């Protein structure tokens, strides 16, 4: 049998319908030589700092920076049931190969690979790469499944991004929180985005209305423009251009 793993239940249901996996089980669909199951977003993620050392449970400036030599991964408590379902399916002797059917992108690749590796699965898998859940698109995708190795670099890029977010978030948040004695959350994307909003808000709050003029001069095919003139002209000089 072939085990297909989607990113979320709704996608799993759409794929199962096309493949003929119509028998509903606890956490998966089965039928027509297919088992279709799903993740629930990120089932596996990087462990918190306290998982590396108990002393990191308390935020201290002296412990920074925290940079793991070997990364640990964990499954959130509310997602452990579905992770166990996937583990059991991967170990099912009837399953000979898998299809990664998570979203076609960097994060989708990461979601599947972390589950696959955390489960200790070594069975071969192919990649379904589609951008639509129309029945015809799903059929076309399964007719042209891609080799998993084509997406190894995509997975590595996603994993590097995840680790970078962890390093910036854990260390930045603890640094500024301990320095200013209040929780200040820092993120690789969140913080610069917030800075842009603050900068924009500052410009709006200090904005003062000003009267200005835009001067336009046109003659035949010639156009001249002077923008943002602060002072209104009290006299005018006329320029006569020769015509041809």
Residue ranges of model-derived segments:
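Intrinsically disordered, low-complexity regulatory segments
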Residues: 1-159
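Generic structural motif
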Residues: 9, 41-43, 105, 133, ...
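Structured, non-catalytic alpha/beta "coupling" segments that mediate domain-domain communication
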Residues: 26-52, 191-233
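C-terminal or mid-to-C-terminal helical accessory/interaction module adjacent to the motor/catalytic core
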Residues: 138-214
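Conserved small/polar residues in nucleotide/adenosyl-binding loops
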Residues: 237-243
């Amino acid at each position: 049998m072939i085990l297909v793993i989607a990113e979320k239940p709704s996608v799993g249901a759409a794929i199962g319908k096309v493949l003929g996996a119509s028998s509903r089980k606890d956490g998966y669909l089965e039928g027509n030589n297919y088992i279709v199951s799903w993740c629930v977003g990120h089932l596996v993620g990087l462990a918190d700092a306290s998982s590396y050392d108990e002393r990191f449970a308390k935020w201290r400036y002296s412990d920074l920076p925290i940079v793991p030599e070997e990364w640990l991964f964990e499954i959130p408590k509310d997602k452990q049931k579905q992770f166990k379902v996937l583990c059991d399916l991967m170990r099912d002797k009837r399953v000979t190969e898998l299809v990664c059917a998570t979203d076609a992108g960097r994060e989708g690749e990461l979601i599947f690979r972390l589950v696959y590796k955390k489960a200790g699965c070594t069975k071969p898998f192919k990649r379904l790469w589609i951008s639509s859940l129309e029945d015809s698109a799903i059929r076309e995708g399964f007719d042209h499944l891609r080799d998993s190795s084509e997406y190894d670099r995509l997975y590595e890029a996603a994993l590097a991004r995840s680790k970078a977010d962890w390093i910036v978030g854990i260390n930045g948040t603890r640094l500024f929180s301990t320095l200013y004695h209040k929780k200040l959350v820092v993120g690789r994307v969140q913080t610069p985005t917030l800075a842009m909003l603050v900068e924009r808000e500052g410009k709006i709050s200090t904005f003062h209305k000003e009267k200005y003029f835009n001067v336009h001069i046109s003659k035949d095919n010639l156009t001249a423009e002077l923008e943002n003139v602060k002072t209104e002209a009290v006299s005018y000089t006329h320029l006569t251009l020769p015509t041809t």
